Amino acid sequence: VKKPIKIPEEYKDYILDMSEYREVNDILFISDVMITDYSSVMYEFSLLRRPMYFYAFDQRMYENSRDFYEPYEETVPSPSVIVKTFPALLHALDDTDNYDYDALDRFVRKNFKYTDGKSTDRFIDEIILK
């Protein structure tokens, strides 16, 4: 992380900056909400069906330097989960009761053929027993 965010003192008991923690999958299960930017971790977290917000304060700069395969607004579950400022992020976190879970479900259906937890069974049936 080149420029980490500053977490206001009053939120330090609720918001953890995990950008230096290397095993991100370990913390997904204990997280109520995920704040990310352009990371592919959104796919894993979406399977937990918990709110995700995309803190894209530098989106134009990122697009100019690296770009995306698809428009960013179409990559995330909904443009409404993209926030550009820290105050907007705090507002979104305050309003998770109104999170668009329908958009999250559409995102999961678009990106995953199976979400039934039976991937190992299918693997055994198709690869080992065939």
Predicted regions and their residues:
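C-terminal alpha-helical cap of glycosyltransferases
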Residues: 116-130
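Short beta-strand/turn micro-motifs composed of small residues
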Residues: 1, 36, 56
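Catalytic donor nucleotide-activated moiety binding site of glycosyltransferases and closely related
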Residues: 1-19
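Conserved glycosyltransferase catalytic-site signature
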Residues: 21, 38-39, 120
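Short acidic alpha-helix that forms the nucleotide-activated donor recognition element
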Residues: 22-30
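Acidic donor-binding loop of glycosyltransferase active sites
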Residues: 29-39
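Catalytic binding pocket for nucleotide-activated donors in carbohydrate/polymer assembly enzymes
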Residues: 6-11, 40-111
